[in-house]
């Protein structure tokens, strides 16, 4: 469905909750973001239990309009730790951490350099039993093959369905088809995918979000 079609829908004829009941179980799981402390009347987020780690520090070749490396500033800096990823995870676990997100800045192809840390992730999984999720950008075939050996809890994957957003916001020489290729690649290797669609990513405008949804629905999640 095109974004413009939203305005033509007669929502008085639609029962959203009935549609939800027909397609999903009664239990809903909510996740609180872990990059910044937050608290509501019903929920208090903890930065200690699930920790984000940047394997590149605050360095990112894309330096895109989405975050201008600011997201990396809220992550633990692995290069500054001057140790291996396993050692950092073990130290975190000793202080109460249950899981980690392995992320970092991208190269010009929007790929986070995860391959040097695959063996450490395997050890974290097998020896420490911690939850491991990764944010890989647009991983190539070799990276997906390696990630499949880690037994990950999930891959956080931004899905973009609009060419202008990819070019103007991410400064990336890629197409929406490249994002679908990565979805196919991860599914083929049996890696659980947690797709993200960022509403208004094109400077606050809705561009390609429906296309991203249509892309995602082709694959089992």
Regions found by a protein language model. Name each.
Residues 3-61, 65-76:
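N-terminal [4Fe-4S]-dependent radical SAM core
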Residues 14, 219-221:
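A glycine-rich, aromatic-flanked flexible loop/lid motif
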Residues 23-24, 128, 189, 219:
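Helix C-cap/helix->beta junction micro-motif
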Residues 32-33, 53, 69, 86, ...:
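Structured catalytic core of nucleotide-sugar glycosyltransferases
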Residues 70-84, 88, 92-116, 124-143, ...:
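Core AdoMet radical
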Residues 120-124, 186:
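Hydrophobic positions in alpha-helices of CheY-like receiver
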Residues 135-138, 171-175, 198-214:
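Active-site glycine- and acidic-residue-rich loops that bind
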Residues 182-208:
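Conserved strand-turn element in the central/C-terminal portion of the radical SAM core barrel
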């Amino acid at each position: 469905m095109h974004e413009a079609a939203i305005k033509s829908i007669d929502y008085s004829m639609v029962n959203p909750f009935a549609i939800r009941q027909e397609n999903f179980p009664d239990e809903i799981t909510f996740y609180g973001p872990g990059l910044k402390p937050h608290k509501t009347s019903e929920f208090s987020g903890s930065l200690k239990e699930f920790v984000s780690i940047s394997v590149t520090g605050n360095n990112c070749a894309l330096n895109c309009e989405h975050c201008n490396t600011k997201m990396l500033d809220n992550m633990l800096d692995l290069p500054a730790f001057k140790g291996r990823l396993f050692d950092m995870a073990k130290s975190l676990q000793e202080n109460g951490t249950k899981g980690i997100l392995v992320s970092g800045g991208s190269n010009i192809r929007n790929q986070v350099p995860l391959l040097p840390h695959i063996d450490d992730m395997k050890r974290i999984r097998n020896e420490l039993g911690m939850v491991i999720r990764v944010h890989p950008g647009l991983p190539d075939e070799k990276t997906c093959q390696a990630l499949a050996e880690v037994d990950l809890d999930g891959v956080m994957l931004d899905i973009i369905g609009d060419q202008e957003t990819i070019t103007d916001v991410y400064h990336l020489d890629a197409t929406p088809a490249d994002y679908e290729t990565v979805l196919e690649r991860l599914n083929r290797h049996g890696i659980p995918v947690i797709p993200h669609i960022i509403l208004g990513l094109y400077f606050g405008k809705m561009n390609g979000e429906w296309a991203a949804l249509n892309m995602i629905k082709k694959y089992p999640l």
